[in-house]
């Protein structure tokens, strides 16, 4: 645990396994009120955290609460019953100390095991300007009843950049935003969400929830977008364009709203202003069967400006 007043701490090259609870805890649950309480400039790098939560099942691999300038990079986190990496600890739009945190280059897999609900490979909470979730490989996220998501931006998550990630084989979706504002989701690969692929649970009238651009979404019969308990896409509260969508079944469902029961055709979706420059086409992965999501040079996504930011698609 890296607690109150800690600065300049680095945890590197450790193996943490067979854990009753979580792996590494950074920061506190409360917003610091004095200089000596602040937790900042921490690095958690190149560690292996596995087989956790054996007593307290809801434990997290790396938990970052009210802390800033924290780097969680190049770790492998696996075989937990709950979230892999959690960042921020303010519910909704209230005061938050968490900002400028980087979650990059981690391999997070075999999370949830179908035991608990409402989790993510990477989970964020609250307003976090400057925070980025970048170039992570996340796969095999499985929830009990609901909420097995790859990247999960929970209540109030705002001003966060999610880019260059490869997320696949989740029970409920590669990306989920509960509610938040002005998040940027770009240059990611989201593949093979069982129930849905991209989920927004609660939109807000007159607020841009997220900008979704230059992503590749591969489905196998589930809708590309899903609206949750209080999201109506007719509110026009997201910006989505220059994406590539493909369904292995040949029957693409662009969007389904749980609140209204409505399904949108591509033409109806575009009539709302969404995805007018996006295309429905095979993204040309190296091998979906082998879960190698490396793009061939002839991929249509590259023509739309998709950026291969990282070593996309390989487990490493």
Label every PLM stretch briefly.
Residues 180-183, 188-193, 205, 262:
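Active/binding-pocket-proximal capping segment
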Residues 205-316:
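Acidic, glycine- and Ser/Thr-rich low-complexity intrinsically disordered tracts
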Residues 1, 20-26, 53-60, 81-87, ...:
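Short glycine/acidic-rich loop motifs that flank beta-strands on beta-rich extracellular proteins
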Residues 2-12, 29-46, 63-73, 90-102, ...:
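Surface-exposed loop/turn motifs in large extracellular/passenger domains
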Residues 139, 168, 183:
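Extended polysaccharide-engagement surfaces of secreted carbohydrate-active enzymes
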């Amino acid at each position: 645990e890296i607690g109150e007043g800690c600065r300049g701490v680095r945890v590197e090259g450790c193996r943490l396994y067979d854990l009753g609870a979580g792996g590494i805890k950074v920061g506190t649950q409360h917003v610091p009120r004095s200089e000596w309480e602040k937790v900042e400039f921490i690095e958690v790098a190149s560690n292996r955290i596995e087989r956790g939560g054996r007593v307290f099942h809801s434990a997290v691999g790396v938990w970052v609460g009210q802390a800033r300038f924290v780097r969680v990079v190049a770790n492998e986190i696996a075989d937990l019953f709950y979230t892999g990496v959690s960042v921020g600890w303010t519910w909704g739009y209230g005061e938050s100390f968490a900002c400028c945190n980087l979650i990059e280059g981690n391999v997070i897999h075999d999370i949830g095991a179908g035991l608990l609900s409402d989790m993510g490979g990477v989970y964020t909470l609250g307003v976090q300007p400057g925070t980025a979730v970048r170039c992570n490989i996340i796969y095999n996220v499985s929830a009990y009843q609901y909420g097995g998501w790859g990247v999960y931006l929970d209540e109030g998550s705002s001003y966060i950049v999610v880019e260059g990630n490869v997320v696949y084989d989740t029970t409920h979706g590669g990306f989920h935003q509960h509610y938040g504002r002005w998040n940027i989701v770009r240059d990611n690969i989201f593949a093979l969400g069982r129930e849905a692929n991209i989920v927004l649970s609660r939109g807000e009238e007159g607020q841009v929830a997220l900008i979704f651009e230059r992503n590749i979404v591969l489905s196998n019969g589930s809708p590309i977008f899903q609206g949750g308990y209080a999201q109506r896409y007719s509110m026009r509260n997201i910006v989505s364009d220059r994406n590539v969508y493909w369904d292995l079944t040949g029957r693409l469902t662009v969007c389904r709203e749980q609140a209204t029961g409505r399904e949108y055709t591509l033409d109806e979706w575009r009539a709302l202003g969404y995805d007018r420059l996006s295309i429905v086409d095979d993204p040309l992965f190296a091998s979906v069967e082998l879960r190698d999501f490396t793009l061939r040079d002839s991929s249509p996504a590259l023509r739309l400006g998709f950026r291969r930011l990282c070593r996309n698609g390989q487990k490493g």
